[in-house]
């Protein structure tokens, strides 16, 4: 585990299970339908879920017969994922606390997986420094077998500029900053800062190519409405 702090850990520690009450988490089944249809994954395929959070995509993939390893920087979220996996006896899902920036140096997970997912700013796009997103992509690339496939979502810079009037968008870095209130299971409110790395399609192509990926497709999607 990296000794580098990540701002998201405090948010996860406050929200815990309440994270799964947020509306953007309700489209998990449809998103997994899309992932399986797009990748052509078969029962028993090996997935890594980078920035898995409390495991909503990992667990759904495991229910469909995939073998999944989820990693996340938040121990609180990993604990939730492990608890829910055990409750459903999903022996084909495992969860590990690991900073996605350190995946590139975590040899036990290298060249192991058929597919990778990194969705809803679980890791990619939660970094304030562009170099960290590059590190994450390089680590994902190293975790995949030859010809492995990554499905990743990133926040659209054009959408952020047009629709996030209350956020501060830094055009030079592509980072959007805003403050918002989050609630935990007890309804306790905490005001927090959010930073989101936003990308144009061209920027995604460039950063993915730097990490050794070939782009197969870029689509505009919304939570629970993934399509090509």
Indicate where each model-derived feature is located:
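A short SAM/SAH-binding and catalytic strip from SAM-dependent methyltransferases
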Residues: 114-132
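SAM-dependent methyltransferase
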Residues: 147-211
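A short acidic, Gly/Pro-enriched loop at the edge of an enzyme's catalytic core
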Residues: 106-115
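A short glycine-rich, Lys/Arg-flanked "PGG" loop and its adjoining helix->strand segment in the class I
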Residues: 133-146
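Conserved SAM/SAH-binding loop
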Residues: 54
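Class I SAM-dependent methyltransferase SAM/SAH-binding core
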Residues: 58-103
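Conserved class I S-adenosyl-L-methionine
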Residues: 1-42, 44-51
């Amino acid at each position: 585990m990296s000794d580098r702090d990540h701002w998201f850990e405090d948010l996860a520690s406050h929200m815990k299970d309440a994270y799964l009450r947020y509306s953007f988490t309700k489209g998990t089944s449809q998103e997994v339908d899309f992932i399986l249809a797009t990748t052509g994954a078969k029962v028993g395929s090996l997935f890594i879920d980078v920035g898995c959070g409390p495991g909503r995509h990992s667990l759904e993939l495991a229910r469909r017969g995939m073998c999944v390893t989820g990693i996340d920087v938040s121990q609180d979220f990993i604990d939730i994922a492990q608890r829910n996996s055990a409750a459903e006896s999903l022996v084909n899902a495992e969860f590990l606390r690991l900073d996605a920036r350190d995946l590139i140096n975590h040899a036990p997970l290298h060249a192991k997986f058929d597919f990778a997912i990194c969705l809803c700013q679980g890791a990619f796009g939660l970094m304030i420094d562009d170099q960290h997103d590059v590190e994450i992509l390089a680590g994902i690339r190293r975790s995949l077998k030859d010809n492995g496939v990554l499905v990743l979502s990133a926040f659209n810079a054009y959408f952020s500029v047009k629709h996030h009037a209350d956020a501060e968008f830094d055009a030079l870095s592509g980072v959007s900053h805003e403050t918002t209130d989050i609630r935990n299971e007890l309804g306790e409110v905490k005001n927090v800062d959010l930073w989101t790395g936003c990308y144009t399609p061209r920027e995604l192509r460039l950063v993915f190519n730097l990490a050794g990926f070939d782009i197969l497709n870029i689509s505009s999607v919304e939570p629970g409405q993934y399509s090509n």
